[in-house]
Curated annotation (Swiss-Prot):
GO biological process, any: translation
Protein name: Small ribosomal subunit protein bS16
Pfam families assigned: Ribosomal_S16
Signal peptide: none
UniProt KW Ribosomal protein keyword: yes
PANTHER family referenced in this protein's UniProt entry, alphabetically: 30S RIBOSOMAL PROTEIN S16 (PTHR12919), SMALL RIBOSOMAL SUBUNIT PROTEIN BS16M (PTHR12919:SF20)
GO terms assigned for molecular function: structural constituent of ribosome
UniProt KW Ribosomal protein keyword: yes
Record's keyword terms, sorted: Ribonucleoprotein, Ribosomal protein
Family classification: Belongs to the bacterial ribosomal protein bS16 family.
InterPro entries named in the record: Ribosomal_bS16, Ribosomal_bS16_CS, Ribosomal_bS16_dom_sf
Length: 81
């Protein structure tokens, strides 16, 4: 199954995340198919940028967002249906 999920990047105790499409069997920070955006919770205000067209295209093809990504997409106004 293909998932839309967060890939952890950055230094120790200073993480930021890339929003990627990856096979559910690959490791969290491992191989991914495509990068869709990024999320940085350490900045004030929190930085979140995503390509809504790519997200919707992947979801139409059957990709499932993780719970965290789903919450972030809902907050930003990108539809998750």
């Amino acid at each position: 199954m293909v998932k839309i999920r967060l890939k952890r990047m950055g230094a120790k105790k200073a993480p930021f995340y890339r929003i990627v499409v990856a096979d559910s069997r690959s490791p969290r920070d491992g191989k991914f198919i495509e990068e869709l955006g990024y999320y940085n919770p350490t900045t004030e205000p929190v930085t979140f940028k995503v390509d809504a067209d790519k997200v919707n295209a992947w979801m139409k093809n059957g990709a499932q967002p993780s719970e965290t990504v789903k919450k972030l997409l809902d907050k930003s106004g990108v539809t998750t249906k």
